[in-house]
Curated annotation (Swiss-Prot):
Transmembrane regions: 24-44, 52-72, 76-96, 107-127, 140-160, 164-184
Complexes and interactors: Interacts (via PXQXT motif) with host tumor necrosis factor receptor-associated factor (TRAF) proteins TRAF1, TRAF2, TRAF3 and TRAF5. Interacts with human protein ZMYND11; leading to negatively regulate NF-kappa-B activation. Interacts with host UBE2I; this interaction induces the sumoylation of various cellular proteins. Interacts with host IRF7.
Encoding gene, per UniProt annotation: LMP1
Top-rank taxon, per record: Viruses
Disulfides per UniProt: none
Domains as described in the record: Two regions, C-terminal-activating region 1 (CTAR1) and CTAR2, have been identified within the cytoplasmic carboxy terminal domain that activates NF-kappa-B.
Identification of the protein by name: Latent membrane protein 1
One record GO biological process: symbiont-mediated transformation of host cell
Predominant location category: host cell
Family matches, as Pfam families: Herpes_LMP1
Lipid bilayer topology: Multi-pass membrane protein
Topology, Cytoplasmic side: 1-23, 73-75, 128-139, 185-366
Family assignment from sequence similarity: Belongs to the herpesviridae LMP-1 family.
Length: 366
């Protein structure tokens, strides 16, 4: 089974109503041919059988109709073929009533009335099926009028007992059932299922694209929402692409030994002017041995009130550790103005600056 690239893989297949076997079709065609021959012999012969001739001819026509339904629309055998079969049984009962007498005749009449009621009920049920399939009021009225007209003409044929009238009545019944078959072919379930398309369902390709976009957004969100924690006995773990030069200030909780002599940010702990590089970004010329990654000069009287502290490297700084500026958390990275916003802070409840054992959490958001 080929897949529809627009709708994706097909769902579980429905059990189809397979075509009849070739042997059964051949047998049905043979029976249909024999029924046509018998019907033509009865109608076109000079045999005068009276009302029984009309009933035999009508019974053969019903057999022909049932065989046609079996060959071309086997799925309609239950409603439409059942209607023809019930009409055939009522016709055979009426033929039997022609030779009955006494109590058997009365019982046969009761059965005949019961059979006629069954035919009427099955016809109403079939009209309801046509209504559910989309038949209009005018189409239903046309079928109802044709059905009752065929019954009235059959009664007239029983009264006239003429072969030519019987031929017309039988052809009218055949035309009625053929009209129903043709209508069912264009409006029945088999025809509508082939062109049915449910647009309420999401397109599989669209669902795949939505999921891919969602996964991309989740991955981007995961890249931009980082949390870096450090233990109390060592420097915090930080990304090398996010930080600023220099180490933490003296006496800061982020520097275990309170000095930056042995920090990874400055290999020789000196700058170009021979000054020690204990506090990193506070060099006079704002340069060190590691190159041009030092931040720009800062204003000692800025709004941060750090009195010579490190420059404000981020757009938003949350410092719960004290009045000193936040320590540098990376080694040698430059103060790129295009870096994401850093959010720095300690997890201590009281903001104790002298507690070196408090875990440090660092996160940033775009």
């Amino acid at each position: 089974m080929e897949r529809d690239l627009e709708r994706g893989p097909p769902g579980p297949p429905r059990p189809p109503l397979g075509p009849p076997l070739s042997s059964s079709i051949g047998l049905a065609l043979l029976l249909l041919l024999l029924a046509l021959l018998f019907w033509l012999y009865i109608v076109l012969s000079n045999w005068t059988g009276g009302a029984l001739l009309v009933l035999y001819s009508f019974a053969l026509m019903l057999i022909i109709i049932i065989l046609i339904i079996f060959i071309f629309r086997r799925d309609l055998l239950c409603p439409l073929g059942g209607l023809g079969l019930l009409l055939l049984m009522v016709t055979l009962l009426l033929i039997a009533l022609w030779n009955l007498h006494g109590q058997a005749l009365y019982l046969g009449i009761v059965l005949f009335i019961f059979g006629c009621l069954l035919v009427l009920g099955l016809w109403i049920y079939f009209l309801e099926i046509l209504w559910r399939l989309g038949a209009t009021i005018w189409q239903l009225l046309a079928f109802i009028l044709a059905f009752f007209l065929a019954i009235i003409l059959l009664i007239i044929a029983l009264y006239l007992q003429q072969n030519w009238w019987t031929l017309l009545v039988d052809l009218l019944w055949l035309l009625l059932f053929m009209a129903i078959l043709i209508w069912m072919y264009f409006h029945g379930p088999r025809h509508t299922d082939e062109h049915h398309h449910d647009d309420s369902l999401p397109h599989p390709q669209q669902a795949t694209d939505d999921s891919s976009h969602e996964s991309d957004s989740n991955s981007n969100e995961g890249r931009h929402h980082l949390l870096v924690s450090g233990a109390g006995d060592g420097p915090p773990l930080c990304s090398q692409n996010l930080g600023a030069p220099g180490g933490g200030p003296d006496n800061g909780p982020q520097d275990p030994d309170n000095t930056d002599d042995n920090g990874p940010q400055d290999p020789d702990n000196t700058d170009d002017n021979g000054n020690t590089d204990d506090n990193g970004p506070q060099d006079p010329d704002n340069t060190d041995d590691n190159g041009p990654h030092d931040p720009l000069p800062h204003n000692p009287s800025d709004s941060a009130g750090n009195d010579g502290g490190p420059p404000n490297l981020t757009e938003e700084v949350e410092n719960k550790g004290g009045d000193r500026g936040p320590p540098s958390m990376t080694d040698g990275g430059g103060g790129d103005p295009h870096l994401p916003t850093l959010l720095l802070g300690t997890s201590g409840s009281g903001g104790d600056d002298d507690d070196p054992h408090g875990p440090v959490q660092l996160s940033y958001y775009d």
